[in-house]
Amino acid sequence: MKALILVGGYGTRLRPLTLSVPKPLVDFCNKPILLHQVEALVKAGVNHVILAVSYMSDMLEKEMKEQEKRLGIRISMSHEKEPLGTAGPLALARELLTENSDPFFVLNSDVICDFPFEEMVRFHKHHGKEGTIVVTKVEEPSKYGVVVYEAESGQIQRFVEKPQVFVSNKINSGLYIFSPAVLDRIQLRPTSIEKEIFPAMAQEGQLFAMELQGFWMDIGQPKDFLTGMCMYLQSVRQKHPEWLHVGPGFIGNVLVDPTAKIGQNCSIGPNVTIGPGVTVEDGVRIKRCTIMKGSRLHSHSWLESSIVGWSSSVGQWVRMENVTVLGEDVIVNDELYLNGANVLPHKCISESVPEPRIIM
């Protein structure tokens, strides 16, 4: 089986992290976002992954060549010369997708969830039509475009954009499976699959919805990235509790790379991931944070709801909170307060940031 992953965007919502790497290569719980998706696809029997690339494609290609060998699968690059929206990339990759008559997966690159790929194949084959969308339940449907479908069969009737009165609380989760016939609907031009292709398919009775049972998050911006981390760690607690770090000073769900060094009298957790080669000095307090590869947290620093980018340094007695994000190789001097700061790569912070703002 094949899968196409839409990885061509600039990832502007996840800056400053995406100024250093393309969004699919940002580390989420100590593994690039893209790798979470690819490994789940391989587990479900996918042996050929096609990446629809444009921004920083060289970096993606280099990383995925290594993964291709490790996973024993074929990974192809489909290069967009201009932005093609969410449907155009399918037309561009048509030759690769139609090498056989099997259905194929299509994924948005910033989705993290309990990937239901095997169930999708069964559901899609059962109804026998052109397309299946995975839908997920949300608390506030008025923020989203919702999917209205028959409860028993899953046949989609219509889509409603940001409804003001309740019609459905199910939204498109960005995971699809299609039969190759769907490609006859898509031309090689900038096209929205959600606004142009799906409504026509629904009208013809060719599109079905399958409800996701586990957690789901679009982690395309820092606030949601941290929420997604909490959900993922809870899922790890249920499925692979042995992956989590336990011991004195560790609270709740904490993921620590074996190469990280943790000092004395720290309080870490709940909901923390600590990456490879990270050093946490004595007396540090961390909760609801991601600390990426090669960073150092100096003694008695206090971090909550923050993301520390690769190879950054947080000084002694620093306090960081309220979705503060440090890009790659940022230095925060001692005894400063950062409240919702968004710090671009390679900066040195020498004064406090009492109100949320971007540091350029």
Curated annotation (Swiss-Prot):
MF-aspect GO terms: GTP binding; mannose-1-phosphate guanylyltransferase (GTP) activity; metal ion binding
UniProt-listed Pfam families? GMPPB_C, NTP_transferase
Query: Region (Hexapeptide repeat domain) spans which residues?
Result: 245-360
Q: InterPro entries recorded for this chain?
A: GMPPB_C, GMPPB_N, Hexapep_transf_CS, Mannose-1P_guanyltransferase, NTP_transferase_dom, Nucleotide-diphossugar_trans
According to its UniProt entry, the protein's GO biological process terms are: GDP-mannose biosynthetic process
Binding residues for GDP-alpha-D-mannose: 110, 218
Q: Which top EC class applies here?
A: transferase
Does Hydrolase count among this protein's keywords? no
Known EC number = 2.7.7.13
For the region Substrate-binding domain, what residue ranges are annotated? 2-222
* Catalytic reactions of this protein: alpha-D-mannose 1-phosphate + GTP + H(+) = GDP-alpha-D-mannose + diphosphate
Query: Sorted alphabetically, which keywords does the UniProt record give?
Result: GTP-binding, Magnesium, Metal-binding, Nucleotide-binding, Nucleotidyltransferase, Transferase
Known PROSITE patterns for this protein?
HEXAPEP_TRANSFERASES
Entry binding sites for Mg(2+)? 110, 218
Q: Which cofactor does it need?
A: Mg(2+)
Please state the span of the N-terminal signal peptide per the UniProt entry: none
Activity control: Enzyme activity is reduced by incorporation into the GMPPA-GMPPB mannose-1-phosphate guanylyltransferase complex. Allosterically inhibited, when part of the GMPPA-GMPPB complex, by GDP-alpha-D-mannose binding to GMPPA.
Please list the residues that make up the active site.
162
What the entry lists under PANTHER family is as follows: SUGAR-1-PHOSPHATE GUANYL TRANSFERASE
Q: Let me see what the UniProt entry remarks about domains.
A: The N-terminal substrate-binding domain adopts a Rossman-like fold and has a binding pocket for GTP or GDP-alpha-D-mannose. Substrate binding is coordinated by an Mg(2+) ion. The C-terminal domain consists of a series of tandem hexapeptide repeats that adopt a beta-helix conformation. The beta-helix forms several protein interaction surfaces involved in assembly of the GMPPA-GMPPB mannose-1-phosphate guanylyltransferase complex.
| Role, per record | Catalytic subunit of the GMPPA-GMPPB mannose-1-phosphate guanylyltransferase complex. Catalyzes the formation of GDP-mannose, an essential precursor of glycan moieties of glycoproteins and glycolipids. Can catalyze the reverse reaction in vitro. Together with GMPPA regulates GDP-alpha-D-mannose levels.
Give the multimer and partner information: Component of the GMPPA-GMPPB mannose-1-phosphate guanylyltransferase complex composed of 4 gmppa subunits and 8 gmppb subunits; the complex is organized into three layers, a central layer made up of 2 gmppa dimers sandwiched between two layers each made up of 2 gmppb dimers. Catalytic activity of gmppb is reduced when part of the complex and binding of GDP-alpha-D-Mannose by gmppa induces allosteric feedback inhibition of gmppb.
Family membership noted in the UniProt record = Belongs to the transferase hexapeptide repeat family.
The protein's name is Mannose-1-phosphate guanylyltransferase catalytic subunit beta
